[in-house]
Design a protein with these regions (language model features):
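Nucleotide-activated sugar donor-binding and catalytic core shared by glycosyltransferases
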Residues: 2-129
Length: 129
């Protein structure tokens, strides 16, 4: 669970827009991710979903089972070192260009339009064929 270590790393920060939350149901969680500026996690699923929302992700692990996200630049491995996590998060929070350069990266998992493409193909098949 990443909540306790992150709360310790950022214990000196009191900011109205920083939230340390308990696990949420899926839809409220996606809503929170969409409204977030930066996501810090140890979840493999979030590493896959956050790029669809255009959110940079710091992963509190030393390895990931999502190498395509690492190669694309949609995630950064920061491990569990307090200073490394703080420094990388600060870089995203303090440098607008760095943030933009690292949040406007193409999603390595696709553009989210697969369903529409499949529906178009199915729609083009004549009935009864």
């Amino acid at each position: 669970n990443v909540r306790r270590p992150i709360a310790e790393v950022f214990s000196d920060i009191e900011h109205a827009n920083v939230f340390f939350i308990e696990p949420l149901e899926y839809l409220p969680f996606v809503y929170m991710m969409k409204r977030s500026y930066l996501i810090i996690t140890d979840s493999g699923g979030i590493q896959e979903e956050a790029p669809s929302l255009g959110k940079p992700v710091l992963v509190m692990r030393d390895v990931t089972e999502r190498p395509e996200a690492l190669e694309a630049g949609t995630i950064r491995l920061v491990g569990t070192d307090r200073d490394k996590i703080f420094n990388e998060a600060s870089h995203f929070l303090d440098d607008k260009k760095y943030y933009e350069d690292n949040s406007l990266i193409a999603n390595p998992y696709g553009d989210g339009q697969a369903c529409s493409r499949i529906a178009d193909v199915l729609d083009s098949i004549p009935m009864g064929s």
